[in-house]
């Protein structure tokens, strides 16, 4: 199983719990979701607990993260969208921290589980729908009828827009899940190839040099992808929240 590149994504129970025939086991995925929240919360707490005019490195990173998301939200959803800052910031930090933790050996990448990313995506779309109807009532349906569309084409356009809207949780979740899954599998394959070549002795060492270089390069790339995927998730969230804030206007 050690050579199986997909073994790292296997959800395994740590504390088996079954109630009424339903499995509520505390798994490795559960553990690392808790660890992700703890790591992100701990970082922000220690980074801001001793704030000063001359910021420490941790404080600078925390402040840059704050400004980064605030600027993204203002551009994506306008000033009125700033009401969602805690929501978007929390999502960004969770996804980013989960992605980064998954880069360490023997750590579990929770964002490589489609059920986790789909739950996050449904949370985003659910927030858009609830706030949209709360803010605009039935006028929220205006997002499915873009202005300037001829009346003859309105039913077709509205149908397409509605299908596009309902597919957002799928596209948002699959994008994050697929990128993290593919990246980690590729790293595992290259690392396994290096180990296999090295086991051949002196003859294999020479052949392992190129795969080793590729593994190091791809590891650096995966750290970049970890940030980019969190960024894309946050950007798309801001764009979707724009519909809730401004409705069909």
From Swiss-Prot:
Protein's recorded name: ATP synthase subunit a
HAMAP family cross-referenced by the UniProt entry: ATP_synth_a_bact (MF_01393)
A matching Pfam family: ATP-synt_A
Bilayer topology annotation: Multi-pass membrane protein
Family annotation (InterPro entries): ATP_synth_F0_asu (IPR000568), ATP_synth_F0_asu_AS (IPR023011), ATP_synth_F0_asu_bact/mt (IPR045083), F0_ATP_A_sf (IPR035908)
Family: Belongs to the ATPase A chain family.
Organism: Agrobacterium fabrum (strain C58 / ATCC 33970) (Agrobacterium tumefaciens (strain C58))
Quaternary structure (record): F-type ATPases have 2 components, CF(1) - the catalytic core - and CF(0) - the membrane proton channel. CF(1) has five subunits: alpha(3), beta(3), gamma(1), delta(1), epsilon(1). CF(0) has three main subunits: a(1), b(2) and c(9-12). The alpha and beta chains form an alternating ring which encloses part of the gamma chain. CF(1) is attached to CF(0) by a central stalk formed by the gamma and epsilon chains, while a peripheral stalk is formed by the delta and b chains.
Functional note: Key component of the proton channel; it plays a direct role in the translocation of protons across the membrane.
GO CC terms: plasma membrane; proton-transporting ATP synthase complex
Keywords, sorted A to Z: ATP synthesis, Cell inner membrane, Cell membrane, CF(0), Hydrogen ion transport, Ion transport, Membrane, Transmembrane, Transmembrane helix, Transport
Cytoplasm among keywords: no
Annotated compartments: Cell inner membrane
TM region positions: 29-49, 84-104, 114-134, 140-160, 193-213, 216-236
UniProt-recorded Gene Ontology molecular function terms: proton-transporting ATP synthase activity, rotational mechanism
Main location: membrane
């Amino acid at each position: 199983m050690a050579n199986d590149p997909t073994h790292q994504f296997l959800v395994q129970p740590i504390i088996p719990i079954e109630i009424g025939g339903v499995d509520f086991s505390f798994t490795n995925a559960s553990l690392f979701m808790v660890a992700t929240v703890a790591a992100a919360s701990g970082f922000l707490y220690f980074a801001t607990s001793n704030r000063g005019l001359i910021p420490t490195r941790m404080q600078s990173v925390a402040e840059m993260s704050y400004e980064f998301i605030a600027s993204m939200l203002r551009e994506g959803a306008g000033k009125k969208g700033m009401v969602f800052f805690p929501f978007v910031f929390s999502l960004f930090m969770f996804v980013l921290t989960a992605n980064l933790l998954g880069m360490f050996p023997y750590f579990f990448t929770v964002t490589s589980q489609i059920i986790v990313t789909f739950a996050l995506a449904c949370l985003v779309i659910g927030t858009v729908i609830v706030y949209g109807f709360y803010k605009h009532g039935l006028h929220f349906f205006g997002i499915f009828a873009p202005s300037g569309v001829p009346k003859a084409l309105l039913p077709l356009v509205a149908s397409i827009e509605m299908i596009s809207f309902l597919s957002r949780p799928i596209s948002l979740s699959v994008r994050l899940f697929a990128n993290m899954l593919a990246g980690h599998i590729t790293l595992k394959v290259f690392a396994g190839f290096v180990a296999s070549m090295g086991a051949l002795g002196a003859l294999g060492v020479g052949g392992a040099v190129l795969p080793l270089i590729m593994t190091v390069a791809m590891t650096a790339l995966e750290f970049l992808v970890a940030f980019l995927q969190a960024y894309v998730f946050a950007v798309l969230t801001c764009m979707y929240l724009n519909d809730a804030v401004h409705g069909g206007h």
